Amino acid sequence: MNLKKTMMAAAIALGLAAPAAAAEKYKIGYDIYFGGNSWSVQLYKEFQAEAEKHKDAVEVSYTESELKADKQVANIEDLITKGVNAIIITPISPTAVIPVLKKAQAKGIKVVLLASKIKSKDYDALVTVNDEDFGKVGAEWLAKKLNGKGKIIALNGISGISASDDRWAGAQEVFKAYPDIQVVSAVDASWDYAQAKVAVSNLLAANPEIDGIWSQGGGMTLGAIDGFDAAQRKLVPMTGEDNNGYLKRWVALTDKGYTSVAPSKPTWLGSESLLVALKLLKGEAVEKDTIFPPPVIDDANVAKSVRADLSDSFWVNTRLSDDEVRAAFKD
């Protein structure tokens, strides 16, 4: 009798456990829009780390778009075919993805835009920082450092990508209030060290007077510094970003009078995008546009922000653990 009761109890326990074991996970599609710089890699790693924390609830399908808008459209089509419940993308083009995102929404798929906008409202949530404010922070700081006058170079990312366009729009709005600040040249350097160094070197050769650099990327600012060094020109005030390698250089140059400011677009947005997607899938209330103010590193707090023990490739505004950072970046 006792054996029979024990077997029945076990059967009941198994029966109770069965629905939990059989519970379906949310299917999330995540498009890695680009893997060509450390910021985009860390953005993806932040998402991946958050997904690992929720591995009992989510199953992720990854695609890679290699900064190609047509490939991103095809990847979203593929994710729709796979029957995902939500798609998280960083739009490469603000227009090219609109038709396929409409298609996804028509099938009941939640669409979360990560770190970049589109020119329509065909999405369920946007998670980003205010890129116009990012541009304004650096521009206002630079204008004041130059006492409202001087010749500057502007280093942009990639025209057509909303983050780059919005940052430059914000900066231009500020510079309009300072008529004695002359933008000698505004160049696209793709957030890339080498492209920025070449561009700055060429502009220094053609312009005996450059008083400042407005840059919307830490790697580009490093390229600008090295361009000045190669030309044997005295460093000028430059804006940067929260790239650890840039912060290390900044700290090393403070004794020489170098000064900077670094607004940030935190890579933890990748983590936040999954949390927002999960809320949407659970039917919880979510703001359509979650837009954070850009954190700012300046001369007063850079020494506390830099991580001398971690990779130059690392971006300091993160939710990753030190071990996760070391696993992501081996340099």
Model region roles, listed by residue range:
Residues 1-8:
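Bacterial N-terminal signal peptides that target proteins for export
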